[in-house]
Amino acid sequence: MKKVKIGVLGGYRGSSMINYCVAAGNAEVVAICDKWEPALKRHQEIHPDTDITYYLDFEEFIKHDMDAVVLANYATEHAPFAIRAMKEGKHVFSEVLPCQTMKEAVELVEAVEKSNLVYAYGENFCYMPAPYEMKRLYEEGKIGEIEYAECEYIHNAEPIWHSITYGEEDHWRNNVYSTFYCTHSLGPIVHITKQRPVRVFGMESHKTERKLRIGAKSGQFAIEMVELENGGIIKSVHGHLYKDSHYYQIYGSKGRMESARPDTKSGNIHMLYVNADEYSGEYGEEKIEAYKPTLSHAEISKIFGHGGGDFYSMYYFVEKILGDKNADTIDVYEALDMALPGMFAYRSILAGGMPMDIPDLRNKEEREKWRNDTACSDPKVAGDMLWPVFSGGNPQIPEEVYKRMMLKHIEEFEANTGYVNAAFTQSSEQGVEAREHSNDIMMRDE
């Protein structure tokens, strides 16, 4: 079997993708690049008997003999690296998010179109058991056409913030606005229904206490109210509310389906409830189905992170490169359908809640309006179009907050404890288990 040669940019978040490549029958990792040398050393320890080349310098890495690049670098920097990789003739798997500005969005779309290469957006929440089964049911017409949906990605990252920002004041996580990181909530609904978001208004919490004490400048959570092209409505909630939750619900024209709420202890994102009539207007006896979906490659997918989503997003990416036109990847247009509602929700927030139309960059004429739009909250990118991180104005955070976070990160890393070390330990264990199941990954979907 031909194997796709893959390089991974970002040794920390990229660990799961690296393990997929090490274990897979359809791919192999040939290069890893990270500016943080300890990450490279950890992978050398985890994968001692492999022909992997390690790079600190991206310019050297991108010249390596490889077919594809996984972008697991900072979430605000994916578009420029994706464009560069495609110019070098590499297929691209992009972690979330696809771009930071509309200028980048236009350039990314045009780079993909020009390259004729595979661009896959790695929104792994789309491939978790419940939302992925919801996609299958929706496509077969189980609940009819979407009328309303709710989705939420709640992750109170305060306990691990020092580990994932290193105490750096200018780390992207401390400086993105509240609606930016929206595709873990919105993405699955877009992927399930294939309906394009056309209009949005946003709201953000003005409660910031928990964010300020960890050095983050945005509101604690945000809401996007999204209108779809068929007139359906989505309510998307995401951010740092106190207790974590991943949840998806869709009301269709003849029924409803939803994943389990986490506090029910019934399976969370692995459990699905379906209540649908045979036809709209039947109003017959309630027919509630409750079950844990079993997907293809279910056993091997359990080894990987995000409810198996890390497995399926990579598996389909590689299969698409190998020629499977039906491989369920998320292309650049769908990636922007997932991400632009967050960008334009913040424009709405800054405009006092005014609804905003969402551009469709499939339309070449529509691109011209946005070709030079650099508006974002990153001063290195925005130029004279800089947004505040928080609609109430950027808060002043004492330097001591970042010093405290940095010290805690260093202490844990040197003691081989904490979130980062646990992630690498999990990666090592994951890699061993994945290699034991490597033959499973060689199986093609029927």
PLM ranges: what are they?
Residues 331-390:
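A contiguous, mid-protein "functional segment" used to position or interact
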Residues 94, 119-121, 150, 259:
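Hydrophobic residues in well-ordered beta-strands that form the structural core
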Residues 179-183, 187-277:
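Glycine-rich, aromatic-lined ligand/substrate-binding cores of catalytic
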Residues 1-48:
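N-terminal Rossmann-like dinucleotide-binding module
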Residues 124, 254-331, 370-436, 442-446:
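C-terminal glycine/acidic-rich active-site capping loop/insertion
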Residues 12, 118, 125-216:
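Predominantly a Rossmann-like dinucleotide-binding segment in NAD(P)-dependent oxidoreductases
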Residues 38, 49-111:
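Beta-loop-alpha module in the N-terminal Rossmann-like domain of NAD(P)-dependent dehydrogenases
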